[in-house]
From Swiss-Prot:
Gene Ontology biological-process annotations: defense response
Organism (species): Arabidopsis thaliana (Mouse-ear cress)
Described purpose of this protein according to its UniProt entry: Potential disease resistance protein.
Name this protein carries in UniProt: Putative disease resistance protein At1g63350
Keyword Repeat attributed: yes
Amino acid sequence: MGISFSIPFDPCVNKVSQWLDMKVSYTHNLEKNLVALETTMEELKAKRDDLLRKLKREEDRGLQTLGEIKVWLNRVETIESRVNDLLNARNAELQRLCLCGFCSKSLTTSYRYGKSVFLKLREVEKLERRVFEVISDQASTSEVEEQQLQPTIVGQETMLDNAWNHLMEDGVGIMGLYGMGGVGKTTLLTQINNKFSKYMCGFDSVIWVVVSKEVNVENILDEIAQKVHISGEKWDTKYKYQKGVYLYNFLRKMRFVLFLDDIWEKVNLVEIGVPFPTIKNKCKVVFTTRSLDVCTSMGVEKPMEVQCLADNDAYDLFQKKVGQITLGSDPEIRELSRVVAKKCCGLPLALNVVSETMSCKRTVQEWRHAIYVLNSYAAKFSGMDDKILPLLKYSYDSLKGEDVKMCLLYCALFPEDAKIRKENLIEYWICEEIIDGSEGIDKAENQGYEIIGSLVRASLLMEEVELDGANIVCLHDVVREMALWIASDLGKQNEAFIVRASVGLREILKVENWNVVRRMSLMKNNIAHLDGRLDCMELTTLLLQSTHLEKISSEFFNSMPKLAVLDLSGNYYLSELPNGISELVSLQYLNLSSTGIRHLPKGLQELKKLIHLYLERTSQLGSMVGISCLHNLKVLKLSGSSYAWDLDTVKELEALEHLEVLTTTIDDCTLGTDQFLSSHRLMSCIRFLKISNNSNRNRNSSRISLPVTMDRLQEFTIEHCHTSEIKMGRICSFSSLIEVNLSNCRRLRELTFLMFAPNLKRLHVVSSNQLEDIINKEKAHDGEKSGIVPFPKLNELHLYNLRELKNIYWSPLPFPCLEKINVMGCPNLKKLPLDSKSGKHGGNGLIITHREMEWITRVEWEDEATKTRFLANRSSFSSSLICFSNDLVSRDMNCFHL
């Protein structure tokens, strides 16, 4: 009898069957799943893009993205990359399948791929089904670290608004605030930082870092990490490079604002783990610095200068600090307070320190004493040597090179608020050997301009351009006090650097120890006589210009063996120098311009080192005998001198083998004029040339012939001449010519030589009654054939009282730099060489000024577009520009003695 039994196989078989079905479905349904994955991913990306657009609108309203939205967006970004990888492998994987997907050439590989596609499809579907009722909320202020802030600086409100609006522009990723020390850069940066506590504007984090003078990358990394809540042993044990990479990857997922206060050199954002701000990531970096060079190196397109306060704003800040009790304690104190405030020159740091000191001074005498101290030696004023000057000295210390530092200190030799010509400064520096002039004057001057540029960009000098085109610099009064303080060894050796300029001195001041004096400036005083002997064994510079000097004793210069620079210019009653000047064996610079000097001093030939001699505007000079003995002379300036040139003078000057720069005024009718103009040696040196005829005598020759060697000529003036032609050499070039002035040249008919002056910036032509063409077409044939386009750098064109002038040029010119055309008294000038594209465009675009409305209405324009451009705003500027034109005529008349 057998035993029978049964095993329940059905459940097991079902499970195995389901498992096999699922495995097979990964490959069997692969193509269908891939299509679904691609479609669903496209829908997810569209949903993501819609959400991002909504978020942009919300962020612009000052709202902040919710955390769950950020998480969802990060997941979409991650899964998009993985889906792309799967879809990129699609063709290869489908080719492996056979038997309608029930089998594969590589079953394991196809199974894994099919499973990945299936699972990724489920993830994408889940993300795509997500619905968000709310995507943003009011921005949290917890990520903004408010900085302690002194009361807002009076007058900086507009600057704050401008800075904020500029920073919020989409195209601005990095903004630099620059300016001199103590001007309020950090205060302004703090105000911008604290403004984010009210308006986050969609930023996730606002980070503030103070950068030390010596950049420490690791310290900055740690500080930024702390601000974004990265800390712990894992961070601390990372190397500097690892910290940078980690922080970079962390910050690139955020929208941040980074404030870097007080940087002195370029900060490499990559090194400190900061992604560079772009339009795409919408991050911002804002920094303060004293150097414009730093702004440039950081990639700032439009640096914002933080300037000193205007007078009214400065006084408002000053009186607010002093307080009404003190100001009201005596009626005179309020008036004196304006004088004291003005001494601070709008510098907030100085205004704060000085006002705090004066807030308890309630007698008129105390205020008068304060003014005296600030005028005589401000470093002694309370708070100056410990709160103001040391802070400014950081800028001085950061200058690269002792020569640059010395050049800054030299600027302090001039009076307060002095406008200093750049060329004068550079000449002093060369002759003091601060700048090496051994390789030529041009190279030394270029170095001088580079130094001035570096001082301007370091916010230590201020740059201006005068109406006559002169380039000048100014020294802020507080910076000047700092320079004097440094030059006197921080106040320990006041007699080493004596500056008593423009203080009303009537005699040489008393000095305890003349042997320590290195530089002395007594310019612009009332010292009629220099008597006795000064034992100044270390003196290298002595500036005595414009001191009403009449006489110098014979022994005055006997003990100045190191004197290199002596400026006696502007002393109109000084008619001779003592023979003792021969004792100045180290003298390299002697300026006798605008003096009453009649002849060169007898001892001049002993000055073997003299390289600069200035005799400009010497109306009494009758002899230059002996000048050929100055074998090392490189620069001789005679412009405006009434000295009558002759053949002997030409020969003497030609004997100066080292001469590089010459400026002069010559009479059109003197015997030596033609010889001078034909001297290739002298013409190769000429930098300024003025030809005039004030005697009304007729010249033997009717033309002036210019040689081909005038490549140094920068300014050319012709006055009251009977010349009918300015003739050029065949291959003539005036490559350095910047300014040309012609007046009362009544026989001149054209100025075609100007075609060969590619760098000409200013052209004034006045009262030349027979002038018909500026550039004559027939005579310009060779230049036109060579492809020369005239006036590529012309900035100003002034044409006055030219009755016969018909043409400037016969066809439209680009004039890419032209800003002004002033026309008056030119009735026959019926067409201007302009088209609608000519001249500068934009804010400083070309304008045409005139006095006669009848003339401008008769002008024949190139086309309607040209007419529209230059006449569109005529009514808005004609009356004011008529006045401006009159001013120019007045200036020109003074210049040309009309």
